[in-house]
């Protein structure tokens, strides 16, 4: 199943924390999560699917001091 994944790492290492994890499973659902000290938090899943496989889209993420 095709998917898109965007991760905002807290450091330049692969095993670092992930402040924001965004994964689109085209045609199915979207998952958002974060990882601290090697442990994933509770994922947030959305069945609201605005993305379609093969269709172009713009991804814009606002980064504020206290939230995304």
Curated annotation (Swiss-Prot):
Question: Might you report a single GO cellular component term?
Answer: cytosol
InterPro entries from the entry? ConA-like_dom_sf, Galectin-like, Galectin_CRD
Say if the entry is tagged with keyword Cytoplasm. Answer: yes
Q: Cross-referenced Pfam families, in alphabetical order?
A: Gal-bind_lectin (PF00337)
A Gene Ontology molecular function term of the record? carbohydrate binding
Q: What is its main location?
A: cytoplasm
Task: State the protein's purpose.
Answer: Regulates immune responses through the recognition of cell-surface glycans. Essential for the anergy and suppressive function of CD25-positive regulatory T-cells (Treg).
Q: How does it assemble?
A: Interacts with CEL.
* Protein name per Swiss-Prot or TrEMBL: Galectin-10
Q: What organism is the protein native to?
A: Pongo pygmaeus
């Amino acid at each position: 199943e095709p998917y898109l994944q965007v991760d905002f790492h807290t450091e330049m290492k692969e095993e670092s924390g992930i402040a924001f994890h965004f994964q689109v499973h085209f045609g199915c659902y979207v998952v958002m999560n974060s990882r601290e000290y090697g442990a994933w938090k509770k994922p947030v899943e959305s069945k609201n699917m605005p993305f379609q496989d093969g269709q172009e889209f713009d991804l814009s993420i606002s980064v504020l001091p206290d939230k995304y």
